[in-house]
């Protein structure tokens, strides 16, 4: 049962070796630093050694050769460490995938939550930010608030009209205006109508609805 994967890995390694042979050692220099392997480091070492040998046997070339070898050893160590870290991450990823699959198989009650329906929800009673009112209750509260706000605006406009003198102040029960109320009822009715019209105009002007 395990032979096919081994054969596939061998085939992949064979393909990589063929590609490396076709490209040659120079192909290692064109790779990204994150894609380098130990074989690529060996190819780079071969290229640099060949170039140094072409320079001759000058003592300075020999000293430079030792430095280049040291740098290549450091590069090889970094590449090997990166490869090991990558393999560890892949193994951890596969392990986590298996754990997630196992948890999904062991937790079928999650399907029960879907059966609540589109118009239902689960509320945590210990959550201080949980919803405490229904949507209809909030709508009623907002409607009542807007109604009271409009009434307050009317009262404020009427008070402003009294203060500015647009509406004359009313006298008390013992005043002359109340004594002559029967005689001047028609005038008062017309005046009250005019006062309401002024208040209405002022209110609509404040609301941006002047007629």
From Swiss-Prot:
What gene does this protein come from? RILPL2
Q: Describe the task this protein carries out.
A: Involved in cell shape and neuronal morphogenesis, positively regulating the establishment and maintenance of dendritic spines. Plays a role in cellular protein transport, including protein transport away from primary cilia. May function via activation of RAC1 and PAK1.
Q: What is the effect of changing residue 149 to E?
A: Loss of interaction with RAB8A, RAB10 and RAB12
**What name does this protein carry?**
RILP-like protein 2
- GO CC terms, sorted: centrosome; ciliary basal body; cilium; cytoplasm; cytosol; intracellular membrane-bounded organelle; membrane
Coiled-coil segments on the chain, per record = 70-164
* Subcellular location(s) of the protein: Cytoplasm, Cytosol; Cytoplasm, Cytoskeleton, Microtubule organizing center, Centrosome; Cell projection, Cilium
Q: Which residues carry this modification: Phosphoserine?
A: 107
Where would you say this protein principally sits, based on its record? cytoplasm
Q: Which residues form the RH1 domain?
A: 24-106
Q: Which Pfam families match?
A: RH1, RILP
Result, substituting residue 130 to E: Loss of interaction with RAB8A, RAB10 and RAB12
**In this protein, which residues make up the domain named RH2?**
130-201
- Family note: Belongs to the RILPL family.
Keyword line = Cell projection, Cilium, Coiled coil, Cytoplasm, Cytoskeleton, Phosphoprotein, Protein transport, Transport
Under the subunit heading, UniProt states: Homodimer. Interacts with RAC1. Interacts (via N-terminus) with MYO5A, the interaction is required for its role in dendrite formation. Interacts with RAB8A; interaction is dependent on the phosphorylation of RAB8A on 'Thr-72'. Interacts with RAB10 and RAB12; interaction is dependent on the phosphorylation of 'Thr-73' on RAB10 and 'Ser-105' on RAB12.
């Amino acid at each position: 049962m395990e032979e096919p994967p081994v054969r596939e890995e061998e085939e992949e390694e064979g393909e990589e070796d063929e590609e490396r042979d076709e490209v040659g050692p120079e192909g290692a220099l064109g790779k990204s630093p994150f894609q380098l392997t130990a074989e690529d480091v060996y190819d780079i070492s071969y290229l640099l050694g060949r170039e140094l040998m072409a320079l001759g046997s000058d003592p300075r070339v020999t000293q430079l050769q030792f430095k280049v070898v040291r740098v290549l050893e450091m590069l090889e160590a970094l590449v090997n460490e990166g490869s090991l870290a990558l393999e560890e991450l892949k193994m951890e990823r596969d392990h986590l995938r298996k754990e997630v699959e196992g948890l999904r198989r062991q937790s079928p009650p999650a399907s029960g939550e879907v059966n609540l329906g589109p118009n239902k929800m689960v509320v945590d009673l210990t959550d201080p930010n949980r919803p405490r009112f229904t949507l209809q209750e909030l709508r009623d509260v907002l409607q009542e608030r807007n109604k009271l706000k409009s009434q307050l605006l009317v009262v404020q406009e009427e008070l402003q009209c009294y203060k500015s003198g647009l509406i004359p102040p009313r006298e008390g029960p013992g005043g002359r205006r109340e004594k002559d109320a029967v005689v001047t009822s028609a005038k008062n009715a017309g005046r009250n109508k005019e006062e309401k019209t002024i208040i209405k105009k002022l209110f609509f002007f404040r609301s941006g609805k002047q007629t």
